[in-house]
Amino acid sequence: MVEKNKEYIFDIISQGYEGEGIAKIDNKYPIFIEGALKGEKVKVRIVKVNKNFAYGKLMEVLEASEERVNPPCAIYKRCGGCKLQHASYKAQLDFKWDRVKDCVSKIGKLDPSIVKYPLGMENPWRYRNKVQLPIGLINGEVKIGFFAPRSHDIIDMESCLIQDEIGDKVVKLTREWIEKFNIRPYNVDGEYDEKGIVRHIMIRRGFTTNEVMVVLVTNGEKLPHKEEFVDLMVKNIPGIKSVIQNINSKKTNVILGLESKTLWGEDTISDYIGDFRFNISPLSFFQVNPIQTEVLYGKALEYANLTGNEEVFDAYCGTGTITLFLSQKAKKVYGVEIIPQAIDNAWINAKENKVENVEFFVGESEVVIPDLINKGVKADVVVVDPPRKGCDKKLLDAITNIDAKKIVYVSCDPSTLGRDLKVLEENGYKTLEVQPVDMFPNTAHIENVALLIKK
């Protein structure tokens, strides 16, 4: 065992699911050390001790991995945004590959050789088309940035290397406006001030269209000097198309409220994924890395291997982005989603893109899909793109009961993917391949697409 606040020297033998280094005592008791890489010898101070594991703080790298690099971000060690900037991009992809293989083999009980090497980015920086940052007044100074890990302390940010560069400029201008007109933030020294006005700033940009939306989230309708804010954005932000005030007066960690007022320009901006154009409002869901989204959806379409004669189900279809991709090669695609507003947007997206061979349904996929089967729809291919918690067990049961010929599983969590693949394998399906896609470079997150066929 180890003792809290004492320092030890460890060899890092592996990495955890969040990218942290792992050392072991007697090959049993794990120590988790953020910032350490596999193969390194490190000096560590123990900060937390539990019965089955401990956490350590990296004090010094005694023998560095060849894959260690100097993080280019000035606030990397304090910010909670990225976890892997200290690793080369190759090492990041290797880690994510190992993680997916580990989940597929240990949780899914499958041969890890079915997991292909991750599809990475040519440039793993500046890939996010959306940034949302809290605004605070800390010790009398205006802070706009990210929360520190496991806290509400705002780490002031001048530039974020994974966000679009236009966001840096908007943040600078917003800070200048707050300071010039003495606009009081809602977050004051880590506490919520009911008299505070500004809560967050959000920037969205269409990478293909170059259209920019700036959203200022306020604690109520009151917004003094809003004309000056609008003027500052319109005169200084290239591609600006929309300046919006979003009102969120609730005591909550949820960033956006339900009411938005357009202060200048349009209510939405637009962007493309492949050949499809999508309208984006402040509250719209839209993948934050459009470059890799096209790669992800392209792989899903490749796995579906449609000839134009198939009827396809798209479960958890959201606003219909994957549905539209599938429509290019399918006879008909049926999208199912439990959130009514998402289905409203899906119909709008289909209409905007003149796609007619799709139909959308509000409801639980495990109820809607069997009902459509009973009405004569064929289950040639089922595509699922569930949230992080994975597929509902009832949906997996429904898929196996309707005897779908092929399943394409799009996943944002390797652990729940492994769990669900195991269930499907036990119920008549065979997993042919899993393809990781790196949607979030410099973080520990990894997306996957899996192909299953009926045995």
Swiss-Prot record:
CDD domains associated with the record: AdoMet_MTases (cd02440)
Binding site for S-adenosyl-L-methionine: Q287, Y316, E337, D385
PROSITE patterns in alphabetical order: SAM_MT_RNA_M5U, TRAM, TRMA_1
Alphabetized UniProt keyword annotations: 4Fe-4S, Iron, Iron-sulfur, Metal-binding, Methyltransferase, S-adenosyl-L-methionine, Transferase
Chain ranges of the TRAM domain: 1-60
GO biological process: rRNA base methylation
Residues that coordinate or bind [4Fe-4S] cluster: C73, C79, C82, C160
Signal sequence bounds: none
Listed InterPro entries: MeTrfase_TrmA_AS, NA-bd_OB-fold, SAM-dependent_MTases_sf, TRAM_dom, U5_MeTrfase_fam
One GO MF term attached to the UniProt entry: rRNA (uridine-C5-)-methyltransferase activity
UniProt keyword S-adenosyl-L-methionine, yes or no: yes
Entries under SUPFAM superfamilies matching the protein: Nucleic acid-binding proteins (SSF50249), S-adenosyl-L-methionine-dependent methyltransferases (SSF53335)
Keyword Iron recorded: yes
Matches recorded under Pfam families: TRAM, tRNA_U5-meth_tr
EC number per UniProt: 2.1.1.-
Superkingdom as given in the UniProt entry: Bacteria
Active site per database record: C412
NCBIfam families in UniProt: rumA (TIGR00479)
Family per similarity comment: Belongs to the class I-like SAM-binding methyltransferase superfamily. RNA M5U methyltransferase family.
Listed name of the protein: Uncharacterized RNA methyltransferase CPE0367
Organism annotation: Clostridium perfringens (strain 13 / Type A)
